[in-house]
Amino acid sequence: MAASALHQTTSFLGTAPRRDELVRRVGDSGGRITMRRTVKSAPQSIWYGPDRPKYLGPFSEQTPSYLTGEFPGDYGWDTAGLSADPETFARNRELEVIHSRWAMLGALGCVFPEILSKNGVKFGEAVWFKAGAQIFSEGGLDYLGNPNLVHAQSILAIWAVQVVLMGFVEGYRVGGGPLGEGLDKVYPGGAFDPLGLADDPDTFAELKVKELKNGRLAMFSMFGFFVQAIVTGKGPIENLFDHVADPVANNAWAYATNFVPGK
C-alpha cells in the first residue's frame, strides 16, 4: 500500500500540502527531481472511499474505523487489528508494496526460463530452485546458459555484489533519492516512471490498486511455487504440464494425501 505516513498525506489522499513545505524539502531550483506531484481532490475511483468494494461484498462485517478507503488496496479487512496503530499501518503499506514488486519479479523469473526451455532455448538449469546450485558445479553458473554474458563460480562474490547493488537501491529508496530530495519512498516517479504512466492523478490512483492486486496474487503464487518445489521437486511449468496430462493423479489433493517429508 502507499508508504507515506498518515500525517504526510498529499492532496491525492485528501489534504493538499503547502507549496512552501515542498520548497523547503525539495528546493525551488526548478530542477527535474521533485516530489511526486499532488492534485486538488481525492481519486475519482470506485476503489477508494467509504463505498469502495469490501472483502466479502455485501456480507462484509463492520469495517474498522481506521480503514477509511483512503489508501489503495483497502478492502476493509483487518481481523487481527494489525493496522490499528497509524505508524504500523504506514509501515505495513510500504512493506506490502515492496514485497508485491519483488513477488511479481520473482514469479516471472520462476516461470519464464521454464517456458523458454520448453521452446528450445538452452539453459544450464531452467528450474528456478535448482538454477542457483549450478554455481557449485565444475563449470560454474552462466547467465542464460551463455558463458560470454556472466560467468560466476564464487558464491561469496555473488553475495557481495548482491549486497552492494541491493543496498544501493534500497538506500536510494529509503533516503528519498540520491541526495535525500524527499521523494516518495514507494512512488518516487521521475526516472522510475519514464513513460509517464502516472502523470494523470486518477490513472495513478487506478495503477496503485492494480499493482497491489497483482502483487498480492504474485505473493500467493510464490508461496505456491515454494510448496510445489518441496512436494513435487519440479518447477511450476512442469507441474502444470503434468496436471493437464493427468488431472486426477496430479493435483493438490493427491499430492497432499500422499506426501511424505524427506521422500
Curated annotation (Swiss-Prot):
InterPro entries: Chloro_AB-bd_pln, Chloroa_b-bind
Pfam families: Chloroa_b-bind
Cofactor mode of binding and number, as noted: Binds at least 14 chlorophylls (8 Chl-a and 6 Chl-b) and carotenoids such as lutein and neoxanthin.
Gene Ontology biological-process annotations: photosynthesis, light harvesting in photosystem I; response to light stimulus
One CC-aspect GO term: chloroplast thylakoid membrane
Subcellular location as annotated: Plastid, Chloroplast thylakoid membrane
Residues that coordinate or bind chlorophyll a 5: K210, Q228
Modified residues (N2-acetylarginine): R36
Positions of chlorophyll b 5 binding: Q162, F259
Binding site for chlorophyll a 4: N214
Main localisation: plastid
Superkingdom of source: Eukaryota
Functional summary from the UniProt entry: The light-harvesting complex (LHC) functions as a light receptor, it captures and delivers excitation energy to photosystems with which it is closely associated.
Protein name from the UniProt record: Chlorophyll a-b binding protein, chloroplastic
Organism (species): Oryza sativa subsp. japonica (Rice)
